[in-house]
């Protein structure tokens, strides 16, 4: 009897996993934990507009992963916020650097980043969400609230410490 039950359970499990759930869409995260928006999964993020190719940022871990990608050399990637983000308890390192700043589009999508703390000390240490926005970079539809931005020797700003004709 036990063998028959186990065989039946196994058959049910195999049949269930082979079913097509046409309405469900899988979302693939990359190694950094970020999810890239595609035409197929865009509706899962409740986005208005075409954000295919953008990285969806829903929480502080996503924002940190996005910053890490940019700081590792991917200066032209795009991002869209899908929720308000509370950065309480995090010591922020700006996105990009002053030698080779951010060149992509960062769309806040009407959301805000709150309690971002970026206190920088040392020679030429800038403070802000972004270190430097380069020509043709875009930051839009973004609110900043209750942040602290200090630099002992250089510039500080909530969105960007420096801008080279960004929009």
Where are these regions (language model features)?
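Hydrophobic core
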Residues: 10, 14-18
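Surface-exposed repetitive/solenoidal architectures
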Residues: 27-167
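Positively charged n-region of N-terminal signal peptides that target proteins for export
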Residues: 1-5
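Cellulosome-associated attachment modules in secreted, modular CAZymes
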Residues: 20-24
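Intrinsically disordered, low-complexity repeat segments enriched in small/polar residues
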Residues: 6-9, 30
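Residue-level signature of transmembrane alpha-helix interfaces in integral membrane proteins
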Residues: 18-19, 75
């Amino acid at each position: 009897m036990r063998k028959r039950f186990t065989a039946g359970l196994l058959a049910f499990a195999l049949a269930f996993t082979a079913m097509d759930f046409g309405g469900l869409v899988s979302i693939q995260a990359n190694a950094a934990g970020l999810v890239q928006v595609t035409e197929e999964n865009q509706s899962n993020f409740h986005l208005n507009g075409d954000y295919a190719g953008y990285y969806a940022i829903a929480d502080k871990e996503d924002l940190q992963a996005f910053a890490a990608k940019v700081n590792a050399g991917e200066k032209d990637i795009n991002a869209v916020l899908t929720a308000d983000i509370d950065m309480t308890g995090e010591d922020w390192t700006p996105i990009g650097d002053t030698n080779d700043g951010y060149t992509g589009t960062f769309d806040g999508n009407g959301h805000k980043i709150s309690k971002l703390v970026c206190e920088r000390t040392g020679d030429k240490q800038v403070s802000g969400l972004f270190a430097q926005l380069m020509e043709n970079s875009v930051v839009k539809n973004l609110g900043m609230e209750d942040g602290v931005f200090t630099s002992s020797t250089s510039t500080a700003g909530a969105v960007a410490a420096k801008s080279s004709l960004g929009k």
